[in-house]
UniProtKB/Swiss-Prot annotation:
It is found in: Secreted. Glycans are attached at N138, N181, N252, N337, N388, N396. InterPro entries: PCSK9_ProteinaseK-like, Peptidase_S8/S53_dom, Peptidase_S8/S53_dom_sf, Peptidase_S8_subtilisin-like, Peptidase_S8_subtilisin-rel, S8pro/Inhibitor_I9, S8pro/Inhibitor_I9_sf. Pfam families: Inhibitor_I9, Peptidase_S8. The gene is SUB11. The active site is at D159, H191, S346. PROSITE patterns: SUBTILASE. GO terms for molecular function: serine-type endopeptidase activity. The keyword Protease applies. Residues 35-116 form the Inhibitor I9 domain. It comes from Arthroderma benhamiae (strain ATCC MYA-4681 / CBS 112371) (Trichophyton mentagrophytes). This is Subtilisin-like protease 11.
């Protein structure tokens, strides 16, 4: 196969792709056999990507005709995000070898599973996160916030779907897209509705006047593929561009999985396009440096605290964490006009997304500057934050 331009998925951090690393080195239970994410070099144009995909499609067909190769599906989807180009597909080893040897290809990774970063604990318990992020000191339930409340900002919830008819959204939620084959345009899991309402619900949310867009990229069990997450990201950027709301958009990823460089690059380019991206650190009580999306650049990564301002026992930590936010025992909306309590860094991330949306609406801050401003405003200290981790706690600057 010549020199392989491939990411070794166990590597903690890569500043450049090592062309000698072997695809076969990647080992993980989350890997999808024969399914790949192919990232093009920075110099490749949109037209060149299209031409390359046509070439790959031809190779795949030739393999079936000449070698009797198994039809694994071939090309699936191309990604064009803010000048970044990639595609996904399922290929046999001979076709993959030709892709790896192509001079327009930067690197190839396995497609992998990714999962939500939250879990249900109980129903109908009292909430505390709203009061906590609007006061420097612990112990109050009152939520104090700027009256703009995210007005004019659009929140993209890339998740299990959203019950857009839930009364907590007050008619501000719309369905965007469903990229998960074999599922309906709804939220049968509940995670997506809960996170969206945490960010932008009328009763349970922080940015109470923000618009909400449902983007279903995880199945009804809370699992998904990075190739679908990337497809959803591309759609969000294009939708925001068409609606002329780049610079006034927030995107939340309450998910976690092993580090995938292609996915990180897609997320980073969505942020660079003009979207504030809040992400979950993950729930493994380990350093999030080797996790995606936590390790992506230009995102605001959230770890989770308890009501006592301790690091939640499950929460990941590490240098990629930008802020802690409430994440244990968080009450929010769930499908079919219900409410529920969930815990996880999944709940912490939309707190950051919601406060970020409010900040963008009230101060006109650019998405690229929001995370730094939130860090500057933060309270704390968080107790026992973990090694090499900030002890700063999300605060909305209410003055209380």
């Amino acid at each position: 196969m010549g020199l392989f331009k491939v990411i070794f998925t166990a590597v903690a951090a890569l500043s450049a792709v090592d062309a000698a690393e072997l695809l076969s080195s990647a080992k993980s239970k989350d890997i999808i056999p024969n399914s790949y994410l192919v990232v093009m070099k920075d110099s490749v144009s949109s037209a060149e990507l299209d031409s390359h995909v046509s070439w790959v499609t031809g190779l795949h067909r030739e393999g079936i005709a000449k070698r009797g190769a198994e039809n694994l599906g071939g090309f699936k989807h191309s990604y064009k995000i803010n000048g970044w180009h990639a595609y996904s597909g399922s290929f046999d080893s001979e076709t993959l070898a030709s892709i790896l040897d192509n001079d327009k290809v930067d690197f190839v990774e396995h497609d992998r599973h990714v999962y939500i970063s939250g879990f249900v604990t109980q129903k109908d318990a009292p909430s505390w996160g709203l009061g906590r992020v609007s006061h420097r000191m612990n112990g109050t339930r009152d939520y104090v916030y700027d009256e703009s409340a995210g007005s004019g900002i659009t929140f993209y919830g890339v998740d299990t779907g959203i019950d857009i008819h839930h009364p907590d959204f007050g008619g501000r939620a719309v369905w965007g897209i469903n990229v998960v084959n074999g599922t309906k345009d709804n939220d049968r899991h509940g995670h997506g509705t809960h996170t969206a309402a945490t960010a932008a619900g009328t009763k349970y949310g922080l940015a109470k006047k923000a618009n909400v867009v449902a983007v279903k990229a995880l199945n009804d069990y809370g699992a998904g593929l990075w190739s679908n997450i990337m497809k959803a990201l591309e759609w969000c950027v294009n939708d925001a561009r068409e609606k002329k709301i780049l610079g006034k958009a927030v995107l939340n990823l309450s998910i976690s999985g092993g580090k995938v460089v292609a996915a990180n690059q897609a997320i980073t380019n969505a942020a660079k396009a003009g979207i504030f991206v809040s992400v979950a650190a993950g729930n493994d009580n380990q350093d999030a440096t080797n996790k995606s999306p936590a390790s992506a650049e230009n995102v605001c990564c959230a770890a989770a605290t308890t009501i006592r301002d301790d690091k939640a026992k499950f929460s990941n930590y590490g240098s990629v964490v930008k802020l802690y936010a409430p994440g244990q025992g968080i009450t929010s909306a769930t499908p079919n006009n219900q409410t529920g309590v969930m815990s996880g860094t999944s709940m912490a991330a939309p707190h950051i997304g919601g406060v970020g949306a409010t900040l963008m609406a009230s101060k006109g801050i650019a998405p690229s500057a929001v995370c730094a401003e939130l860090i500057k405003m933060a309270s704390g200290p968080v107790l026992n934050p973990g090694a090499n981790t900030t002890n700063k706690l999300l605060y909305n600057g209410s003055g209380k």
